[in-house]
Amino acid sequence: MATITAGMVKELRETTGVGMMDCKQALSENDGNMEAAIDWLRKKGLSKAAKKAGRVAAEGLIGALTDGKKGVVVEVNSETDFVARNEQFQGLVKMIAQVALKVGDDIDAINAAPVGSVTVATAIADAIATIGENMTLRRAKLLSVENGVVASYVHGAVVEGAGKLGVLVALESTGKTDELALLGRQIAMHVAAANPQALDAASLDPELIRREKDVMADKYRQQGKPEAMIEKIVENGLKTFYKEVCLLEQAFIHDTGKSVAQAVKEAEGKVGAPIKVAAFVRYALGEGIEKQTSDFAAEVAAVSGQK
């Protein structure tokens, strides 16, 4: 039997929004397995979480930069939000994005790349020494197309091209680049707001689909539905699930009467050529990094019977 720690209960509560005692029971029933505990809570009707959500807990900035047919998004973390408002740090993030646009999204390659008379890694070290706070280049992603545009959107920008959330959208087309760029930015804004998990159903993690089907089937079995009916219900449920998590099937935020795929198809008239949404990337600052919260940890520890 796995030991259920206060940190595990805290993480599950933050992910699902379910009460601490239910979270502790879910973890106990599933031998400490976080994903299984989430599914257990969902089957009990206590949580609607589709999967473990990354909790935004780190500070710093997301930088996004595009240059026609390619674009890059980077995350540079700091210890406090105060540093994110520092002009030197903001300049560092934008410089790293410029370098990544040239050398690609491999972190080692970015750190080793020259910038002036030093490397990026040295520039980061110098900023740490000057500002007095630890910083790190956490991740980067480059998108490019042979024909078309890569558009970007930064939400909560504190300076041009840098903020709390950054999105890139790659559109493949031989049509008018100005119209493509406008559509790309609209889709990027949609991605920022709707947070799709995949481009389409075929791009979804098969394990995620399997889990979703399992949760739905078990839920309806508990309601006493006959097996012959459950299969059809689950099939319809998956269609709804896809509309919630797949970019092309989501209702377009700029016109909720149509899907993103339909909006793209309609835009082909203005663009003058077929359009394919080739890829997207969405970086939210600190997702997956957990900040220490001592008061809440103490509360959880008390419920868990730990000191």
Curated annotation (Swiss-Prot):
Gene Ontology cellular component list: cytoplasm
Keywords: Cytoplasm, Elongation factor, Protein biosynthesis
Coiled-coil spans in chain: none
Lineage top rank: taxon: Bacteria
Compartment(s) where it occurs, according to its Swiss-Prot or TrEMBL record: Cytoplasm
Region named Involved in Mg(2+) ion dislocation from EF-Tu: 80-83
Recorded GO MF terms: translation elongation factor activity
Gene3D superfamilies the record matches: 1.10.286.20, DNA helicase RuvA subunit, C-terminal domain (1.10.8.10), Elongation factor Ts, dimerisation domain (3.30.479.20)
HAMAP family, per database record: EF_Ts
Function: Associates with the EF-Tu.GDP complex and induces the exchange of GDP to GTP. It remains bound to the aminoacyl-tRNA.EF-Tu.GTP complex up to the GTP hydrolysis stage on the ribosome.
Family: Belongs to the EF-Ts family.
Descriptive protein name: Elongation factor Ts
Gene coding for it: tsf
